Amino acid sequence: MADSIRLQTFPSKPRVFVLTDISNEPDDAESLVRYLLYSNQFQTEGLVAVSSTWMKNKVCPQDIHKILDAYAGAVDNLNKHTHPDYPYPSANRLRTLVKSGPPMYGFAGVGTDKPLTDGAQLLLERIKAPIEDPLWVLVWGGTNVLAQVLLSIRDQCSAEEATKLRAKLRVYTISDQDDTSAWIRTQFPDVFYISSIHGWNQYGLAAWTGISGDKYYGFDQGGPDFSKVSKQWIKENIQIGPLGSAYPDYLFIPEGDTPTFLYLIQNGLGDREHPEYGSWGGRYALTDASDAGQQGKHYSDMSDSVIGIDGKTYRSNQATIWRWRNTFQNDFAARIQWSLNPSLASTNHHPIVIVNGSRSQKPLQFEAEAGSTIELDASQTYDPDGDDLTFTWWQYREPSATQWLVQFEVSELGIEKLDTQGKRIKVMVPEPEKSCMDLISRTPLAKGQLLHLILEVTDSGTPTLTSYRRVLIQSTNKDLRGGKPLKEGEELNAIGDAMKNYTD
């Protein structure tokens, strides 16, 4: 039987402020149900009902309250399954955070002549709070509440203060759902802003649809396991108990908004300040990575290559999310069991990953000379329920790449097991010719590629649960070894020069 003191801890909770067009269709309610199951990992600071292009003339805070009423019937059970220092928030506390944005579409609710709504006022207060930690604004609908606040900050604060306040913002939106989103990115390019960009309402082109949209939008057919988001699976595993019963049947795709907070889940996989690293919430890169011009902070979709359930390889932006579907759906189902069952003995809990003595969920970082080896030891890892554990180490190559052709640019780590279970491994850093070369000129670099190694630890409970640890290996080449010898008169000044002899 698990001892609650041995369960996961969350010493650094991200501050979260949700803007939701709940009731335009069922998926916002679905996402809110799941969000509440993770709410002990977050410092929730606002739950604001907003409009969108799909619900232009009203907002529905009452429907947030309905979900919180269901949560009230589950929170005592949930608190039996968390470390005593990191309890779930009470329903009453969350109820005080429910506010409204303007019951009108986009810019119709924004302007210097329009008073701030109570939702915008709360957001402004939380941005101005004397707290250094960033505020994550998760946008499931339109962004006019955020636009109201940014306009107010610009008009009422000095330029220096306004810049400091915007620097505290971290925004993740589910595409653009009103006419203020593009304006925000244009007027305030310094705001950290994750959003898929595509033609208006062409959601099948967006990364976030990888959560569940493969059949509806027709992408990557045969890759993702659709059974884990089917209506039958949801009925059997999610729509049960006091909270799960508030999860409505889906209409288009389930939980389109969920990637915004899957990105923040503290499971050892992601780094919320680095969207390019990848996590359950997808993988995103700066749309302008230059150090000139606007120097904007808009992040948009990247792609991953993933082997699907049919054994074929799929590469897409949606794959950056659906590649994790089995694990995040199992995680969801396990938490639903917590919500209806107070017994630790009859439910499953996450493995606690410890690598080289560290149980932090932040990436473990090394500098290693090209051609050298490092040893990693996860033998102290344990399962609080006493389940058997499976250790899987693999290189996540895509985050190391600077362009599309990953296999051309990113060298492979050597991974050697030092015991039968793979708790301990030796990692061989590639030689400088592979890990510390300029992409185009092929001249040696003192500081080469940042290589990503992922440890997945999966238990034998029901459903199986997975925890992670990311290891970052910064390759170095202090003596500037290697480099491509050039023939007399030969120059490598363009990518075509570097790749002319490359074969995949």
Report residues per predicted region.
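Short strand-edge motifs at loop-to-beta-strand transitions and within beta-strands
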Residues: 423-427
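Ser/Thr/Pro-rich, acidic low-complexity intrinsically disordered regulatory segments
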Residues: 492-504
